[in-house]
Amino acid sequence: MPSSTAMVPGTRGGWHCLVLTTAAALTQLMWLPGCCGSYIVGGHEVTPHSRPYMASVSFEGHHYCGGFLIHTHWVVSAAHCFSDRDPSMGLVVLGAHALLAPEPTQQTFSIAAAVSHPDFQPATQANDICLLRLNGSAVLGPAVRLLRLPRRNAKPPAAGTRCHVSGWGFVSDFEEPPPGLMEVEVRILDLSVCNSSWQGQLNPAMLCTHSGDRRRRGFCSADSGGPLVCGRRAHGLVSFSGLWCGDPKTPDVYTQVSAFVTWIWDVVRASSSPGSTGRSVRAV
């Protein structure tokens, strides 16, 4: 079973492994009764197609990770989703709400190329970002739209800022799929405060959220790669959480997208758009 780990201080000056809850860690168990849950915690179902930038990355017919559309040929997702998966075997579905039901709005693509950040570190989840090039051009419309990125190297939203994270993870610990795309409101947590909860393992290119109260709210496995949207821009990309999803003792951690905007567009510009017969469109 694939998993991701981070190193935390041990009790005798050594280091112990801390298992992180990532999309890749639990999704292979998605059809086993009683497996650990992988779901948007404390959230609600959104109005169908009201988050038209959302993408589902699937393997063998099952949702595996999230992502979001930034260009008619490119989806952003998490690098750890492909640590032990062959991207060429995956599919990207756009325009979906209920993944288990056929919808005329859905557009399905194979993955022509997957470009993980060259400095991605699986052990710590540093630089956990990947670009997926579609094998065709997405047709933009009411159910399929682009999500804007923050300005390059922009400061992250201030602590306390309300943001939203969405995904198709399970809604119970017993493999119950959601009726449709789920979303939860969270608040930005100061990185230094978050870092103390994570034993100093975070870096400045990460971002944290918490519920803002005592309720468990946040993301969990199979939501990895999805966007944290603040002010209509993707400021974060779901990376990892603690053993218990939405637990304030281990705040949710994201890749801070603004730190990678230059790299993102450098990759897009360097690669020709496969199968394109017209003008490519990107979110600005």
Swiss-Prot record:
GO terms for biological process: proteolysis. CDD domains: Tryp_SPc (cd00190). Glycans are attached at residue 135. It is an enzyme of class 3 (hydrolase). InterPro entries: Peptidase_S1_PA, Peptidase_S1_PA_chymotrypsin, Peptidase_S1A, Trypsin_dom, TRYPSIN_HIS. Its EC number is 3.4.21.-. This is Serine protease 57.
